[in-house]
Amino acid sequence: MLCLPVFIILLLLASPAAPNPLEKRIQSDLIRAALEDADMKTDEREIVNIIDSISDVAKQICCEITVQCCVLDEE
């Protein structure tokens, strides 16, 4: 008589739970977003703009520290 409840409890523990529809949808959305992010390619113009911005900041810092950088830019 005790075997049947124990068997049912073990069966419930061993069986996979039904996936929650909301969790399943969130997981699929996250997977889709990750795949889209992986497929994105950085535009070459964006990279050039970033490098130009960094070099402008570096020139400003260099001009504050020494005049040599500013003289090189004027030539």
Swiss-Prot record:
Residues 1-19 form the signal peptide. One of its GO terms (molecular function) is ion channel inhibitor activity. Keywords: Disulfide bond, Neurotoxin, Pyrrolidone carboxylic acid, Secreted, Signal, Toxin. GO terms for cellular component: extracellular region. Pfam families: Conotoxin. InterPro entries: Conotoxin. Residues 20-59 form a propeptide. The keyword Signal applies. It is found in: Secreted. The modification Pyrrolidone carboxylic acid is found at residue 60. Contains 2 disulfide bonds that can be either 'C1-C3, C2-C4' or 'C1-C4, C2-C3', since these disulfide connectivities have been observed for conotoxins with cysteine framework V (for examples, see AC P0DQQ7 and AC P81755). It comes from the Eukaryota. Its main location: secreted. Expressed by the venom duct. The cysteine framework is V (CC-CC). Belongs to the conotoxin T superfamily. This is Conotoxin Vn5.5. It comes from Conus ventricosus (Mediterranean cone).
